[in-house]
């Protein structure tokens, strides 16, 4: 149950989408080095509005990816479809940037949360959880 970084998450997502060549390798992120294993994945993620980074100049590829970030990346990669229904998680505010992504993930059967009433958005997402999210979304 190893943790997962933001760089690994976008790489998994990029590969799950067929590893498409990005139109441009240029991003504003100074922490995405040329030749890094995740460079193409990050460029693809930026082009497809999957991520805007942790700031205008950083992606933070080595930072742990949170559950909120993981489902948001996945939701955006799916085209940010409308999320219907009512949020059942006490720890997901309706105004949180990730709220529609969490609702989509629940509706799509990607995740059920960490309990009936919690999603744990700020908890680090484990590699096993991410693989499960990707598998369930592909079904």
Regions found by a protein language model. Give the residues of each.
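Feature responds to low-complexity, polar/acidic, surface-exposed segments characteristic
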Residues: 1-10, 15-40, 51-68, 76-100, ...
């Amino acid at each position: 149950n190893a943790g997962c970084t933001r760089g690994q998450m976008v790489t998994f997502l990029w590969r799950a989408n067929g590893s498409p060549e990005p139109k441009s390798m240029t991003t504003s992120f100074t922490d995405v080095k040329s030749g890094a294993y995740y460079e193409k994945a990050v460029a693809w993620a930026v082009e497809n509005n999957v991520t805007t980074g942790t700031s205008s100049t950083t992606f933070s590829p080595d930072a742990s990816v949170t559950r909120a970030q993981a489902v948001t990346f996945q939701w955006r990669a799916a085209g940010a479809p409308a999320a219907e229904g009512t949020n059942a998680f006490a720890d997901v505010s309706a105004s949180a940037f990730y709220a529609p992504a969490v609702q989509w993930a629940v509706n799509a059967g990607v995740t059920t949360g960490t309990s009936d009433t919690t999603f744990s958005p700020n908890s680090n997402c484990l590699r096993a959880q991410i693989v499960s999210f990707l598998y369930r979304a592909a079904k």
